[in-house]
């Protein structure tokens, strides 16, 4: 298994790059976001997910950060989502945008590239469960500095439910202190 690869970008293609590591060129499939940030000659580090397809061909999928890698792993566990489809979702949406789409039940965010309404609904349903099970340190910038959310999660509330309640409170009272947000959230969650 390969955890990460650091090397020089030798070629950039439509859906992959060739990364030269010790004079060996590795074909690594990446999202369009990664393709846009790379230039030939750049020295980059990619976190690698290895997949062996039906034809017994090993394919490498590369990510600039662990969040995208973790989301690919979650997405491919959903029935109807393969590595190519998961990578197309990550080309379109960042982990933060996926989280937001799941929280807001936004099926439209996932639709396209072979994903219809039924599969988009399944993605949301299954990711709600998986996101709630993620360790708190694996959450993202949209929630990582939120003390009120951390407090509710430490009290045993589900991450998505707590996030929704806090967002609602903050939209109604944007100047509320952390203590006020927690107090209002506890009242709302205990109803």
Curated annotation (Swiss-Prot):
The RuvA-RuvB-RuvC complex processes Holliday junction (HJ) DNA during genetic recombination and DNA repair, while the RuvA-RuvB complex plays an important role in the rescue of blocked DNA replication forks via replication fork reversal (RFR). RuvA specifically binds to HJ cruciform DNA, conferring on it an open structure. The RuvB hexamer acts as an ATP-dependent pump, pulling dsDNA into and through the RuvAB complex. HJ branch migration allows RuvC to scan DNA until it finds its consensus sequence, where it cleaves and resolves the cruciform DNA. InterPro entries: DNA_helicase_Holl-junc_RuvA_I (IPR013849), NA-bd_OB-fold (IPR012340), RuvA (IPR000085), RuvA_2-like (IPR010994), RuvA_C (IPR011114), RuvA_C_sf (IPR036267). Keywords: Cytoplasm, DNA damage, DNA recombination, DNA repair, DNA-binding. The gene is ruvA. It is found in: Cytoplasm. Belongs to the RuvA family. GO terms for cellular component: cytoplasm; Holliday junction helicase complex; Holliday junction resolvase complex. This is Holliday junction branch migration complex subunit RuvA. Residues 65-142 are annotated as: Domain II. Homotetramer. Forms an RuvA(8)-RuvB(12)-Holliday junction (HJ) complex. HJ DNA is sandwiched between 2 RuvA tetramers; dsDNA enters through RuvA and exits via RuvB. An RuvB hexamer assembles on each DNA strand where it exits the tetramer. Each RuvB hexamer is contacted by two RuvA subunits (via domain III) on 2 adjacent RuvB subunits; this complex drives branch migration. In the full resolvosome a probable DNA-RuvA(4)-RuvB(12)-RuvC(2) complex forms which resolves the HJ. Has three domains with a flexible linker between the domains II and III and assumes an 'L' shape. Domain III is highly mobile and contacts RuvB. It comes from the Bacteria. Residues 146-191 are annotated as: Domain III. One of its GO terms (biological process) is DNA repair. Its main location: cytoplasm. Residues 143-146 are annotated as: Flexible linker.
């Amino acid at each position: 298994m390969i955890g990460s690869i650091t090397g020089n970008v030798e070629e950039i293609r439509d859906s992959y790059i060739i990364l030269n590591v010790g004079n060996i060129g590795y074909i690594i499939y990446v999202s369009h976001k990664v393709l846009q940030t790379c230039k030939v000659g750049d020295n980059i580090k990619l976190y690698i997910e290895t997949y062996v397809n039906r034809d017994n061909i090993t394919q490498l999928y590369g990510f600039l950060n662990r969040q995208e890698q973790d989301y690919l792993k979650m997405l491919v566990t959903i029935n109807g989502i393969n590595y190519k489809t998961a990578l197309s979702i990550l080309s379109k949406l960042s982990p933060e945008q996926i989280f937001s789409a799941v929280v807001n039940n936004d099926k439209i965010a996932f639709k396209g590239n072979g994903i219809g309404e039924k599969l988009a609904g399944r993605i949301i349903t299954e990711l709600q469960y998986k996101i709630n099970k993620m360790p708190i340190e694996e959450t993202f910038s949209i929630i990582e500095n939120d003390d009120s959310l951390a407090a509710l999660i430490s009290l045993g509330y589900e991450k998505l439910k707590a996030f929704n309640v806090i967002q609602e409170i903050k939209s109604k009272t944007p100047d509320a202190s952390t203590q006020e947000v927690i107090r209002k959230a506890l009242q709302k969650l205990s109803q």
